[in-house]
UniProtKB/Swiss-Prot annotation:
Stretch forming the signal peptide: none
The keyword Cytoplasm belongs to this UniProt entry's keyword annotation: yes
Main function: Inclusion body (IB) resident protein that interacts strongly with lipid droplet (LD) proteins. Involved in LD-mediated IB clearing after protein folding stress, probably by enabling access to the IBs of an LD-stored soluble sterol derivative that acts as a chaperone in inclusion clearing.
GO cellular component, one term: cytosol
Keyword Nucleus in annotation: yes
Major localization listed first in the record, in broad terms: cytoplasm
Pfam families: Iml2-TPR_39
Keywords assigned: Cytoplasm, Nucleus, Phosphoprotein
Record protein name field: Inclusion body clearance protein IML2
Organism of origin: Meyerozyma guilliermondii (strain ATCC 6260 / CBS 566 / DSM 6381 / JCM 1539 / NBRC 10279 / NRRL Y-324) (Yeast)
Subunit structure: Interacts with lipid droplet proteins.
Region listing for Disordered, in residue ranges: 206-237
Amino acid sequence: MFKGLRKKASALSLTPTSSSASLGGSNHPQYSKILKQVRDFEIALRAMDFLLDDRAEEGMKLLETESKKHSEMHSDQPAGIFPLAMGVMDFIEATLGFEPEVMARAHETLSNAEAASLTNSKYNTKHQLNTSMIYPPGTEFQVTLAESTLLNALVMLLTENNSFLEAAKALLKLRKAYQTLDSLYKRIKESEPVFNRNLAKLKRGTSSKNVSTVDLPGFESTDNLGSSNASSSSLPEDVKLMNSLEQIFQMRKSRVEGTNLGRDVNPDRVNLFKDASSDHIPRMSSLRDLQANPSPRAVSPNVALQNSVFSNKPIGTDYDSDEDDDEFTDALETLQEDIPISAPMPIYMKSNGGNRIASGTESIISFSTDYSASTSSDLNSNHLHVSTIDEFIHSGVQLCFGILQVVLSLIPPTIGKVLSIVGFKGDFEAGMKMLWRTAITSRNIHGELALLCLLVFYDGPIEFIDNGYQVPNKDSKIAREVFAIDNRSTVSDEELKAITENPSSYTPQLLERARTHFKHNALWILQQGRMLAAQGQLDEAISLMQGFTDDPDNKINMRQIEGLFLFDRSMLYAFRHSFDECARDFVKLVDKNSWSQGLYLFFAGCSYLEKYRMIKLGLLQVENEQETLKELAEKAEHFMKLGPTYVPGHGVNAANKKGGIGGNKKQLPFDKYLLRKMAHLEEVQKQNPKLAFIDCVGTSPYHEIIYFWNGYNRMPTKDLELSIKLLGYSGAPDSEFSANTSSNNYSYIKETMDEAMLRYFFQAMALRSLGRHSEGLALLDSHVISKYVTQDSPLANFKFTKMTYSPFLYPTALYEKSRFVWNLRTSAPDFDVRKSITDCETLLKKAEIVSDIGDYEMSSRTSMNIKASLDRVTKLRNQYL
């Protein structure tokens, strides 16, 4: 009976639904503090979205304005989210370009964010500000503390001119962040049953409310202003609170829909509930009408219906349900309860013209999820039924802990051993799952950063993830079926398994969403260009990126992004052998980025060298050939010699420049590389003083740099064949794949064994990409590995000669041989998967032995590649052996 009475009037006042959530009567100042904090979080998330749209100045201005307003309020309540947002923005800017000034600023801002987070966490705990339905007061600022600590530690580690003491402090910060995130992650997993239960109740209950109270945990609208719970004196404050709730709802709605960055945003233009059962889903309430006429008798049922947020039930009728009388559950009260969660097998169904897996019991945490058919509106609506604070906690922990797990699992073994001693190590698969979940389910800065990480891992120029060891015909059906992951608020373990087995079918969906939301940022164009190149669509990638900068309406505001954009486009031109465009972009980079100016100029010179050779070989026809060759020779010599002058601590042009990571004068690996290459060239020129500089070059460094950026896996057939021919320019007469014969010799110097090893290695890589595995492996064995491996048989210890001419080559050749062996073995119809795994694992361990000869150029990159492959093969061993 009492439940029926409670359902009979329109709602205005807010009262607690459980004693545990009560703050003592109508304590409006306490409610206002909670809503003020939630609004601050939404503002911070919007500011960081501005950065993702290449409008960092607007985002920073928004934060500064809101911080100033907060200070002028003279409130004792902190606003710890603003320093974190500023720190995240500075961190992203710093790690895009490594400029010393930005690195220092990021360190300072993140240190302030750490202090502010700690202060805010203590404040929320002391004043019992219940901003979450399941987590204790202050939890959200434990997340901001962990996030700021992690990012600060990374900044400190990347600033290599720090002292040993500073580096030790950074490792301690990293360990502190790891421990905090590990604890928070376990708490989230333990709280998942409670979260799912509360979410289901919210979805049942909000359909009869005038306003969503999800951001005031433990409270709901009452239905009778005449009751003892609602006094006329509290009505103005109730209206004010409802105004705040509506504003927060609209802020979250526009952020989820991607309309929060427009200058004239109409948050009603996209209706996430258009597929719901009712014929008409009205917009959010118009509280101006309520304020102008606050009497409940003046609000007709029709007006109340129009003012309802989730109006699926008629206003003014009895609606009695035992479920609706349920109180929300506090996670602290129920963590010890045994709440069974069923997990039936997934239901596969056709939806929107494509295959997908549909989920029923939706969890924004999504560690394990039941399956049943559901509409897209069910999936989308969860974003609005989850409070801003809970969303931030879940996405923040999953992003940060995921990044930590992946990065720690990829670092070279020598460093990994040190880190394991101080108490933490990574789990690659667990970390990748966290990143995928965050990228799919979170429409905030955490989701987009998770997506950027995934794109770098899968489509970036460095192979962090080795997917080269695949067992044919062993893939499950789920890996071959592609389902939609856009606009999802949940993803199951079974779905994640399918996604991680076939990532190239899912990253494009997320990237399309990001490009739709952030139309101004060239960073997303860059990522799409990388993705197209990784799929072998080199011309399409170049057309996309060149077309973007050619359009006068497009502008890249952040010079760090412009530098990355130019560098990647330069490499794409290099893969396509568009030498003039490649050199042009590299020369431009000198004015855009100070990170490795010497490499930019050196590679511009190598581009002219390669065009020179292409003309000499008769592969490119030009007018005034002799004049063109002379001009190219001059440009090649000029830029190749100019490059070392920009190397920090070495050249005259670097005397007043702060190059290197963090702006110190420590030389980067590629700085050391080009100094070594130039030293070799100078030695050859001394031995052949009458030769022109361009004729003293052996195997062109052009092909080395292409390999370092994974170019042979991105070239189309014609460019792979052209690479093999160009590499033959310096080959010994009548040798394999050489352009020279005893009667027709293009090269003026003798090909040394060291230069021949380089040439054959790159030709082998091109042959493999052409599918000519046997030829490529034969070159690798006979002309590269046999030159330094002196003993390699099952009955004797592995022995090799330590060579120094090209330090990266020797471990890399063994690493690449394992991939040749795998491809050849698994292409046979009756292949032995166990023997293939064992043989490849043996080769990779030998590569690891050869690699462990101390620090050298590309040592970290080489070790990372070997480790990624070993991890993949070890996984196969555990599966098949």
